[in-house]
């Protein structure tokens, strides 16, 4: 899956940057600090920022007053914690948007497949090229009154049964405006269909990462044909073209050519004493010839082919007059042994798992999430058809529908694995199985913040919950625990090294850690703002990640000050008579957070 490589590349970039920042913080930062921070008294009298400092002092006082109440009352603390967690989970379930696979990106290229009516010659198909070129020509010659984008490149290729075309614009941001321009000339021709889309950065076909494939499988084409026509009509009614959706059939139902069919008559063959194999070989001799053997000639193997002198000049009408030698040595004509007819047949035959298949390709408009469309197709088309089908015809979904299912399973597994690794790491560092559970409660709260941020962004612009956006939740699981770690570790420090009681240690840790928590969080939030606000190439790919991390980090930072103190107090009362929680070894002389 393309999403796997994307996840890996982003994960490597983040991991390397974190490792480098840690190395810099323990080597370069202390050296620079020793040179620039020589007079500690200078930092005791810092200028006040009128409004910000007043708000910050008031907020700190509010948090400490709240902390004094909840750490002294077990029931109040449990009520607050339960309310926060329950409300977060409810919001997470209710506001969880439908899933999407991958964004198409903003690639500067539109591509269209054109299906023409049966019987169109290549020359007739070229008329579509002329009509498209007539529409596109003003867009590459000079400015046009309708202010459509200028075309930088344009091509058209025609063949028997169809054609395809493509174009690119000088302004990559306006490439979508060419889709109706190129599709309009084709839509005016009776029986012709155009499937014009912007090329996807990740899609493997014309449908891109939003293309749903409905495979109609059956034993033969005669059985599949009425089924796929029914399904195509149902899909067209659910997702009409006027709403921006596009539907095409593969292989094209119009891509047919005349075919000469010879059906042997078993009774006539038996009377003449000719087997079906001998009859077929006789036809091959007059058609392309049959290979007798390969003989060496001049150091090479040369094919010895049995054919006739009239092979190149024979006409279709002459097939019935081809002589076949009967068992008694007499000559019998093909027309006496078989029925010869000219019929229409598809140019392409597709099979899946050994069965004939016709694929209906649905390209969704950007306004409908992929998960919503899949659910609607399954409930209204696939499931009812498969239940009622009695002739061996089945429907299967593939394409982006299958990719989304596999990617979603992988993302869920990655989130669980990430949380498990974080938990085990915290167990080793804190020497406790309970304290890491307190820290990890920030993860679902942060996920709620990410969903709320995504909902707010959708009020301004469309941003689906695609798999790239889901990567933001995986990143959150490793980022939002930092603030909780600061508070828990600082509380343990006050208990073990300053001899404080649990209540005083919790309140002191809350007071000490508010400033570094908000310093680190605000720098991260402002660093994410350009990713969310500013447009540009690639912004549609990573805007979802930015808003999820932004919303999750903001909400978890605000709420961590409200549920960590009561949880710590409850846990410490529970183990009051036991060995201190998180008994760190004496080798740790000072917590890393003390330097924050």
Where are these regions (language model features)?
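Transmembrane helices with small-residue packing motifs
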Residues: 1-6, 78, 82-120, 197, ...
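Alpha-helical membrane-interface segments at transmembrane helix boundaries
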Residues: 2-15, 59-75, 98, 232, ...
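Solvent-exposed, membrane-proximal periplasmic/extracellular interface segments of envelope transport
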Residues: 94, 124-208, 233, 267-285
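Signature of alpha-helical transmembrane segments and their immediate interfacial
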Residues: 47-101, 511, 591-593
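Transmembrane alpha-helices and their membrane-interface boundaries in multi-pass membrane transporters
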Residues: 5-49, 165, 483, 518, ...
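Hydrophobic transmembrane alpha-helices and their membrane-interface caps
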Residues: 16, 424-512, 518-534, 551, ...
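Small-residue-enriched core segments of transmembrane alpha-helices in multipass membrane transport
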Residues: 6-25, 85-87, 105-112, 192, ...
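Extracytoplasmic/periplasmic membrane-proximal domains and adjacent transmembrane bundles
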Residues: 228, 232-418, 427, 503-505
């Amino acid at each position: 899956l393309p999403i796997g490589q994307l996840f890996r590349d982003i994960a490597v970039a983040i991991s390397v940057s974190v490792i480098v920042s840690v190395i810099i913080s323990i080597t370069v930062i202390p050296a620079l600090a020793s040179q620039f921070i020589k007079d500690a008294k200078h930092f005791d009298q810092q200028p006040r920022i009128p409004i910000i400092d007043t708000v910050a002092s008031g907020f700190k006082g509010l948090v400490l007053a709240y902390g004094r109440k909840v750490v002294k009352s077990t029931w109040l603390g449990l009520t607050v914690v339960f309310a926060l967690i329950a409300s977060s989970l409810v919001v997470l379930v209710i506001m969880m948007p439908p899933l999407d696979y991958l964004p198409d990106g903003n690639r500067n290229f539109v591509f269209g497949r054109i299906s023409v009516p049966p019987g169109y010659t290549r020359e007739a198909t070229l008329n579509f090229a002329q009509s498209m070129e007539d529409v596109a020509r003003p867009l590459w010659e000079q400015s046009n009154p309708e202010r459509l984008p200028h075309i930088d490149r344009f091509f058209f290729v025609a063949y028997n049964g169809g054609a395809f075309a493509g174009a690119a614009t000088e302004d990559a941001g306006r490439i979508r405006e060419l889709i109706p321009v190129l599709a309009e000339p084709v839509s005016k021709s009776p029986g012709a269909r155009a499937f014009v889309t912007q090329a996807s950065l990740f899609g493997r076909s014309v449908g891109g990462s939003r293309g749903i494939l409905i495979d109609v499988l059956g034993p033969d084409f005669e059985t599949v044909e009425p089924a796929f026509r029914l399904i195509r009509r149902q899909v067209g009614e659910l997702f009409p073209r006027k709403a921006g959706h596009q539907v095409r059939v593969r292989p094209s139902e119009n891509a047919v050519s005349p075919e000469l069919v010879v059906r042997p008559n078993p009774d006539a063959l038996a009377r003449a004493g000719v087997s079906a194999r001998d009859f077929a070989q006789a036809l091959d001799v007059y058609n392309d010839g049959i290979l007798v053997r390969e003989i060496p000639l001049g150091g090479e193997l040369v094919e010895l082919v049995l054919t006739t002198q009239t092979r190149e000049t024979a006409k279709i009408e002459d097939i019935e007059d081809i002589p076949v030698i009967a068992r008694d040595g007499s000559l019998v004509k093909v027309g006496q042994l078989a029925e010869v007819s000219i019929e229409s047949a598809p140019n392409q035959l597709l099979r899946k798992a050994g069965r004939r298949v016709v694929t209906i390709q649905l390209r969704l408009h950007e306004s409908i999430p992929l998960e919503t469309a899949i659910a609607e197709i399954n409930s209204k088309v696939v499931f009812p058809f498969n239940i009622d089908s009695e002739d061996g015809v089945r429907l299967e979904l593939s394409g982006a529908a299958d990719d989304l299912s596999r990617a979603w399973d992988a993302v869920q597994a990655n989130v669980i694995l990430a949380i498990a690794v974080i938990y085990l790491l915290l167990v080793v560092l804190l020497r406790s199985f309970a304290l890491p559970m307190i820290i990890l409660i920030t993860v679902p709260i942060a996920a709620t913040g990410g969903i709320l941020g995504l909902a707010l962004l959708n009020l301004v612009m469309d941003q689906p919950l695609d798999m790239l956006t889901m990567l933001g939740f995986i990143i959150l699981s490793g980022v939002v625990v930092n603030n909780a770690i600061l508070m828990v570790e600082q509380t343990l420090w006050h208990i073990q090294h300053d001899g404080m009681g649990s209540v005083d240690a919790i309140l002191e840790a809350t007071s000490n850690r508010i400033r570094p928590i908000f310093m680190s969080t605000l720098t991260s939030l402002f660093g994410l703002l350009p990713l969310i606000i500013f447009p540009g190439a690639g912004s549609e790919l990573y805007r979802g990640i930015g808003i999820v991390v932004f919303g999750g980090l903001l909400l978890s930072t605000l709420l961590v000050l409200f549920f960590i103190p009561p949880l710590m107090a409850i846990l410490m009362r529970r183990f009051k008579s036991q060995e201190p929680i998180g008994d760190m070894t004496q080798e740790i002389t000072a917590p890393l957070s003390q330097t924050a």
